[in-house]
Amino acid sequence: ATMVSVIDASATTEHELNITGLQTGTRYFYAIGSSTDLLSGPDSGQYFQTSPVVGSIDPIRIWAVGDMGEGNTNQAAVRDAYLNYTNNDHTDVWVWLGDNAYDDGTDAEYQTGVFDMYPTILPRTVAWPALGNHDYGSTHPFVSDNQDYLDIFTLPTAGEAGGTASGDEGFYSFDYGNVHFVCLNSENYTPMDLLLYPNITITHSPAMVTWLENDLASNTNTDWVIAYFHATPYADGTHSEAYSGSDPIKIVDGIIMRAMRDQFVPILENHGVDLILAGHSHDYERSYLTYGNYGTGGPYPPDSTILDGGTGRLSDGAPYQKMTSGPFANKGGVFCVVGCSAKTGSYTSDGPLNHELMIFDDYRLGSLLIEVNDNQLDAFFIDTSGTAWDEFTIIKDLGVTGIPTDPFPIPEEDESVFNNLSIYPNPIIDWFTIEYHLNTPEEVSIEILDLTGKTIATLINENQKVGDYTYTVDAKNTGIVQGVFLLQFKTAGELKIQKTIGQ
């Protein structure tokens, strides 16, 4: 093995060492010391692993924790559950969703809430943190007088790890394999905005907006985009973008959350974001595959904003699917609130979780494990029991070699009763056509369902012989208006469901 020494001779307690000449995708063991004393290492648990070649499709393991910096037994339980679930295997990317050290983000609180809490993980895992309001101080946004965060971390402001240079440690991007990560600063706004309380307007840094547009536009070498920051754009727990009560802190929080929703989510969605991670609300909430929701946060979503109303679970046979070309190219992403890695709210004090976009939610301690393998992303919410309480999968271009736009064929299954099944046009405007070949005589039912599974219209319910069938349907007469609907094809031994969109 080759030994290399890197020395910082300056008399300081804050050392930053720049190491050059490293190989991609390589594990390097290291030791830290002075000219007279060895402080730590070298040993098998103290190493760093360099990023793989950008665009490579090797499996990637990501760990997301949010609002974790309490230094308490809850935080330790979340940590241990993750380590046990993953058999203490290497984590490639560790993202922090803000509020990393309570209550004021001081150096001492980072020591107890972070460094003392992860003594075996930090020496071998690169952390990619986001700023939360408590990292500025407990009086933020009214007073922001603490920035120990910027002294503790050195973050890529010049595009050193991939992406576009931001010039600001509060927001940055990096590449790891075929994933592009974007970290935003949801707390980056001027305190002057708060003087208009309660009619506050929040305008985030124009520099961050411009940078995000440029960064995502230049991201052409990765297959996935994961964005993360602190103040979630959607939640219905301890904080909500739809809060309508009288608590001044929650009013301000709601305005900040809506600002992230309205100013940044459209940019992220327009550039094909796949997964958005955030914290702030002390619970776990996970959305459907969605696009373009800027509604009220109530329990009933505009149908057109939910692109897939299923569970997203591979175990249910219902993974979310995205296409990279065609009429729905790169549309849709999943939003996860993971503000529960050390504390949670409760149904008693904070009320029910009933957000229009969320399919699974709970006041439950835990963290999120994400695994990316080529064109498949799997996510698992690991609670303190050490099990996956929730999971979902996104697959890109599933079984597709040339993506048609019209007609829209349904993938065939071996020995299927239906062959050459297609629906066109899709999206539906006024009329649409259904075509299929029936392999065996069957009693056939074709129904239109809404996303809850309720039947809107029955198109066919009859015995049919072997042969080819074509039906042209007046969409308006069947109840299809703007939104997402399901077409259900059913026989005694087979059930197929195809999503369609009315315009």
Model segments located where?
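Acidic, histidine-bearing metal-coordination/catalytic regions of metal-dependent phosphoesterases
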Residues: 1-76, 80-89, 225, 363, ...
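Residue-level detector of high-confidence beta-strand sites
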Residues: 6, 278, 286, 391, ...
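Extended active-site neighborhood of metal-dependent phosphoesterases/phosphodiesterases
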Residues: 27-43, 47-49, 107-221, 225, ...
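Conserved, compact domain cores that house catalytic/ligand-binding motifs in diverse enzymes
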Residues: 58-130, 135
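Active-site neighborhood of phospho(di)ester-bond hydrolases with catalytic His/Asp-centered motifs
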Residues: 64-66, 93-99, 126-133, 226-230, ...
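Solvent-exposed loop/turn segments at secondary-structure junctions
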Residues: 68-71, 100-104, 133-138, 181, ...
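A short C-terminal boundary segment appended to hydrolase-like catalytic domains
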Residues: 331-333, 339-408, 417, 422
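C-terminal outer-membrane/trafficking sorting elements
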Residues: 413-424, 428-503
